[in-house]
Structures are given as structure tokens and as C-alpha cells.
Amino acid sequence: VSNDGRLLPQMFEGGMITSNEIDNLTLTAGQIERATSRASSNSTGLSVAGGSEASNKFYFAGGDWKVNSDLTAQYYYANLEDYYKQHFAGLGHNLALGEGSLKTDLRYFHTTSDGKNGKEAGYSVGGYTRNGDGKIDNNTWSAAFTYSLGSHAVMLGHQRVSEDSNFVQLNQGGLVNESAGGASVYLLTDRLVNSFTRAGER
């Protein structure tokens, strides 16, 4: 989630633990409590785009399972208290094809409201929501196929965002007088001119 789009990188305060005790399985869990933006030296609580109230509890846990040398499966769960709960599933596969290789990258996010989101002032997500109440309810999926040959690669991809609300991630831009905006996210479109994360975009 850290964004490095400015001179100074975004930083987070919290803790994380990673385990590789089981063969071919990497487990990760942690908690984030505060963030320091790209344009400030002070830390703030956590929020989403449009949210003006801060949360200090972001939990995450999940794992990467290397099924074989060419196939990796991922699952992660995250919860920003009073804003959202998010499930992520991913699948990556490499296939030797002629003199090159074909990489398949599938990603799916299911995000729903948590706690005060959509119920109390300051805990609403920005942008369109189906009932106009700022409630988070989103499914986003993407598929990308990349053929690589030597030092060259060409990618064909598709991403689709459901119509009930925007895709969400940690973004403190709505916190009053903090200038703490900016976020990166695990989507194929993150480094494009537009991230295409608004409700209904594809």
C-alpha cells in the first residue's frame, strides 16, 4: 500500500510477521496503526479516499502457496476498522511457450462495509455509491496475460470494477488539514495514467 510517487516514500507504523516454516507456503500477518504521508513529517491515523475520520486499526493476514514451480496461489484478508473488510484471491502461472514464456496473472478483490462506514458522518467513502450513503460494497477482478521473449514483452489485460462503489484501499487524503493523500494498490492498473478503480469502470 505504500506509495513512492514523491521524493519521500509513504511510511506506516505497525508490525508484521512472516513465516516460511511450511514448505512452499509463506504466511504473513500484521497490524498497521498510523501512516506518514509523502508530503509531511507527522503521522496520521488511517482512512480511505473520502473518509475524514481516522481509524488506528488495519489488520491483514494471508499466504502465498507455491503449488509447483510454475503456479502460485494467494489469499489475503484485510480489515480497516470502521471502514471495510476485504478478501483477495490471486493466481499466477508461467508457461514455457516456444522460445518465450506466457505469464497469467488473475486477481480478485471482494470488499464490504465495516462498522461505522456508511452509517456515521466522516466514515464514508468518496465517489459514487449505489444509495448515496458512502457505503463500501465492491468487487474488482482483473486478468493479464504477458508473453515474454528475450528482453521484450507484450501484455493483454482486462479489469472490471463493480457498480456499487469505488474500489478502496488505504488513503488518508480525506483527513482534514493533513495533506496525506496518495496510495498504491495491488492492481494491474496501478502504474497507468489512470488506475480505473471507480465504480463501473472497466
Located regions from the model:
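Outer-membrane beta-barrel pore domains
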Residues: N79, Y83, A89-R202
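Repeated loop/turn-to-beta-strand initiation elements of outer-membrane beta-barrel proteins
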Residues: V1, N24-T28, T36, S69-Q74, ...
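Outer membrane beta-barrel transmembrane domains
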Residues: S40-A49, S55-W65, A73, L91-G92, ...
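Hydrophobic, lipid-facing positions within transmembrane beta-strands of outer-membrane proteins
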Residues: E13-G15, L25, K57-A61, L71, ...
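Outer-membrane beta-barrel channel domains
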Residues: V1-R34
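Solvent-exposed loop/turn segments connecting transmembrane beta-strands
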Residues: S2-P9, A35, E53-S55, A78-F88, ...
